[in-house]
């Protein structure tokens, strides 16, 4: 993966807190042009650092009131790809992970209520060839949801401050003219 610099990290730090922030504001905060921000964001997307942008829908607002994690044990780990293909046909499943530990995989799904959850478990998940056991954990409350830390180092912060100081000096010099 291509290296990202301190400006890239600053941009990421800003846009991960507010994906709708205008590039003009990001540019002002970073001390560079709007075009530079646009080019940087596009490059970060092209190299796979930024993997998407969009709106997040509150599942409860659509009637999905039960957030559930299900640990799944497969007959054989080699059945993982087959099971994932089956899971892709179940719209309530929003995440799937191949794991170490007591389960072969863990999925996250949303159900309307406990009856809907039971229907999904008994009539959909446990009917898939290769699934031999499930263990269900219902989330009572999501306490934290955030992105991974961008990790601006002291060196990165100093570089950004230097950029800002240089920009401010240019603005001041031009104002005096």
Give names to the regions the model predicted.
Residues 1-177:
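A compositional/biophysical signature of low hydrophobicity enriched in polar/charged and small residues
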């Amino acid at each position: 993966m291509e290296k990202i610099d301190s400006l890239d990290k600053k941009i990421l730090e800003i846009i991960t807190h507010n994906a709708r922030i205008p590039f003009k504001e990001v540019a002002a905060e970073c001390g560079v042009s709007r075009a530079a921000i646009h080019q940087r964001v596009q490059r970060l997307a092209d190299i796979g650092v930024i993997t998407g942008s969009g709106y997040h829908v509150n599942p409860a607002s659509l009637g999905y009131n039960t957030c559930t994690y299900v640990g799944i044990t497969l007959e054989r780990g080699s059945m993982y790809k087959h099971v994932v293909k089956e899971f892709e046909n179940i719209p309530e499943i929003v995440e799937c992970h191949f794991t170490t530990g007591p389960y072969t995989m863990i999925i996250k799904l949303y159900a309307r209520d406990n009856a809907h959850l039971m229907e999904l478990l008994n009539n959909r998940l446990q009917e898939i060839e290769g699934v031999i056991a499930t263990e269900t954990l219902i989330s009572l409350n999501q306490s934290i949801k955030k992105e991974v830390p961008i990790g601006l180092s002291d060196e990165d912060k100093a570089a950004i401050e230097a950029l800002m100081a240089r920009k401010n000096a240019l603005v001041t010099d031009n104002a005096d003219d």
